[in-house]
Amino acid sequence: MGGYLLLGAFLGCGVVFSEALLRSRCGLIRLWFGLVIGLIMMMWSPIPFAFAMRFTRAAQLCGLALSAAIAAGSALIMRGKARYRGVFQGDMPVWMLLCLLIPLAILSGYLQYTHTLREIDGALHVGQSTYGDINMHTGIATHLRNAAFPPDYPILKGARLGYPFLGDSMITSMLLFGADMAVSFRITGTLMMVLVGFGFVAFAWEMTKKPLAVVVAFLLLFVNGGLGFIYTMDGESFREIFTGFYKTPTNMPEYNLRWVNVICDMFIPQRTFLTGWTVLLPAVYLLLLAVREKKRRLFISLGLWAGLMPMIHTHSFLGLGLVSAGVMLQALIGSSDRRKTLINFLLYGGVAVLMAIPQLLIWTVPQTVEGSTMLLRFNWVNNNGDGTLIDNYFWFWIKNVGPVYLLLIPAALCQKRRSPARGFMLGALLLYVVAECVVFQKNIYDNNKLFYVAFMVCLPAVGALLADAIDAIGRIRSLGAKAACAAVMGVFCAICLLSGSLSIGREIASDYVLFSESEAAAGQFIDTETAEDAVFLTGEQHNCVPSALAGRDLVCGSPTFLSYHGLNYAVQHADRRAMLENPAENAALFEKYGVDYAYISNYERGKYAVGEAWFAEHGTLVFESGSVRIYALS
């Protein structure tokens, strides 16, 4: 219970802070910013204290006290000043907001429940999209309990954790006060999805002021998908969408379809992406307000906000920066006072960079630069690796993104010359070009996290273009012509949304056992009966019980995670095999890594010629269930 109260306390601090500083904005905007600020406080405020006292309950309480002091101080300073009292500012329709956010909240809540360690008869179940990534996030969340700072990876002993971990550390904060891990992931995940949904509605409304444009843009973002459905037209392929593992029309690598649905394959499984967008949408909204209102305090506030983003989600931070560069260029072109405009943007960028540098130097640079994960590569996953393309350049993007791709340039050209939308689309173009030419991680696929930011900021303009087209159809006098145009528009929208809808349907139906009853019991035993700094010798499975369910250190984890994170694990990988297969001859390695336990299951027995007789003779069998055995070695 204490963990949920802690979350509520931080959210309350954020709302109080927002109520004080955003007094000129409507109630819903203040609430949105307040809840996001509360999450940021929960992620960031314990960190300075963790360097001094580890990531303990004391650090969380100190962080909460700091957040409460900031909130109370801002409320006192702004006391008595006028406040906008309306729930809505302007004429945003209530029906539009409810019709968009309620289904999103229900869908998100359901998927968070079914996809996050759902217990059935003692086993832990997940969905298709979380079968892989959830192991990394639960491992980090459990590993950070009482950890020294800066922390290390749980899956590679001694390697500094360079992955943006703050979205997982908020779960750690809740765990330290007794919250259930699965419930904590579900509550915060659903909350963040709703905040992302509202944030996009607010941004699209400010850009267009057209309800139909907002609805269209919202659907194109959250039900996104390309032309993959054409590969599922026969009965067998269509059935496989709902029964096969990753046979959805938005994620078919065999057909070079990699533009996945953002709900199914990004927001639900990739918690860092979801947390990043939770913080990104208010930043984009602030950027729009700053350009429109030309107030210096908005630019400085935006700089402070952006400066907190790198360790929340580095891709979102980079995406915001490149989009902002395009917005700045457009603002300078149309400004009557270019000096003031330039100073405003320099203040914004300067504050953000100064705050980001320590984060980048401590965490990001050692992993990205020293790990040699940056490289030049044209056209994302459509590149064979030798400079040649798998598909024709434009066909690749059309079949992945769908017909929406063809509307991006017309939508930009239809904007007024000094419209902020042009600046955002110029920024999207800059981001698109960079993401098309530079890969920032060994997992080339991860550049989609940049493409999605570019896609998102373009959608309000695309929605406005389609809304204008629909309005024009309504004004046609000839019934025949009107019917024909309406049919064309209907087919167009169906093509845009069909692949995404099928993918969401598959995700709703998916159910996989991630940890068997014996493995779940082993995880519970490890979590409660072994020391938090215990080191485990295991196989290389991605769903490794000691790390995923208890956050314990491993000699070496899954190559899938380690390679994509740019970590050099060759020595540890070889040493693991030597210790598992020839433990009698490798006593020095056990001492080198400080191995406390050996975790032996059917996976280890199938992957390695495990010298289990040696472990049974020289270790102590402390846990046995089904095929799982845990031997204490020290």
Name these PLM-found stretches.
Residues 83, 87-93, 290-298, 334-347, ...:
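Membrane-interface helix-loop-helix junctions at transmembrane boundaries of multi-pass membrane enzymes
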Residues 264-265, 298-314:
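Membrane-interface alpha helices of multi-pass inner-membrane proteins
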Residues 104-279, 314-318, 512-513, 540:
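Active-site lumenal/periplasmic loops and adjacent helix-entry segments of GT-C-fold
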Residues 1-92:
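Membrane-embedded, hydrophobic transmembrane alpha-helices
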